[in-house]
From Swiss-Prot:
GO CC terms in record: cytoplasm; proteasome core complex, beta-subunit complex
GO molecular function, one term: threonine-type endopeptidase activity
GO biological process: modification-dependent protein catabolic process; proteasomal protein catabolic process
Gene name as annotated: prcB1
UniProt protein name: Proteasome subunit beta 1
Catalytic residues of the enzyme: 57
Domain of life per record: Bacteria
Species per Swiss-Prot/TrEMBL record: Thermomonospora curvata (strain ATCC 19995 / DSM 43183 / JCM 3096 / KCTC 9072 / NBRC 15933 / NCIMB 10081 / Henssen B9)
Keywords: Autocatalytic cleavage, Cytoplasm, Hydrolase, Protease, Proteasome, Threonine protease, Zymogen
Pfam families for the chain: Proteasome
Positions of the pro-segment in this chain: 1-56
């Protein structure tokens, strides 16, 4: 039988009670089944039978004097198959931050959407913006809540980056499946191709990068990852599928247009014709 509130059009009482500024905590107490991963059947062996959940793969982030650049390849895999060629893994978290996912794509994207609402809900409840470190801590709590699904093989791990308006620098935060939060310096990468991307980042990063050069470094690193990791997709000039690249500076979040990223991709691909291994670092 429907409640009296449904007849009058009023919000349920839970929405009218003063409480936490965390939307995730509110949802957990009011309707926990709506939290990421809760609707999936809890199975000791993970996914049933031979079902393969699509996985997002490689993400990179690079700091530069004016902020931070984050980029992700476009491939999602299911086992040894390419599940999608143009999936997006880098998202705007709020005006001064970006979040990207690697791992189980479905759960990761649910976490991103909930995180976006979490930040907006805090600002509406408290009347002020959450600090960059506060956002990073909120995301860690959300990842920790998914630990049960992670232990069954449905792991989703984000990379969070943004412009710290107090320190006036770009910052990068990584996470483990248990919700541990770690600040990374200069650059970082997560996902199946991260070991190859990190090698490229170490060789190409320098402290005086411009925003455009930092974006180019990200595309170079993703190309190296795709070169050695079959789950990472490189720039597809035929289909015009390029990495998603975003910058976060004092002016806010900006996703680079397809044309701009396409030009960076062509620079990388053209350079590989002469030097297949990519740019080399000086020995001295």
């Amino acid at each position: 039988m429907a409640s009296h509130d449904s007849y009058t059009g009023r919000l349920p009482g839970a929405f009218m009670n003063p409480g936490t500024s965390s939307f995730t905590e509110f949802l957990a107490s009011y309707n926990p089944d709506l939290l990421p991963g809760r609707h999936m059947t809890a199975l000791a062996g993970g996914m049933p039978g031979n079902v393969e959940a699509p996985h997002a793969t490689t993400i990179v982030a690079v700091t530069f004097p004016g902020g931070v650049v984050m980029a992700g390849d476009r491939r999602a895999t299911a086992g040894n198959m390419i599940a999608q060629r143009d999936v997006e893994k880098v998202f705007r978290a709020d005006e001064f931050s970006a979040v990207a996912i690697a791992g189980t794509a479905g759960i990761g994207m649910e976490i991103v959407r909930l995180f976006q609402v979490e930040i907006e809900h805090y600002e509406k409840m408290e009347g002020r913006t959450l600090s960059l470190e506060g956002k990073a801590n909120r995301l860690a709590t959300m990842i920790r809540a998914n630990l049960g699904m992670a232990m069954q093989g449905l792991v989703a791990v984000p990379l969070f980056a943004g412009y710290d308006t107090e320190r006036e620098v770009g910052r990068i935060f990584s996470y483990d499946p248990a919700g541990g939060r770690y600040e990374e310096h200069e650059h970082h990468s997560i996902g199946s191709g991260s070991v190859f991307a990190r090698g490229a980042l170490k060789k190409l990063w320098r402290p005086d990068l411009s925003a455009q050069d930092a974006a180019l470094v990200c595309v170079q690193a993703l190309y190296d990852a795709a070169d050695d990791d079959s789950a990472t997709g490189g720039p597809d000039l035929i289909r015009k599928i390029y990495p998603v690249v975003a910058t976060v500076t004092a002016d806010g979040f900006r996703r680079l247009p397809e044309e701009e990223v396409g030009e960076l991709a062509r620079i990388v691909v053209d350079g590989r014709h002469d030097s297949p291994g990519g740019p080399t670092a000086p020995l001295r």
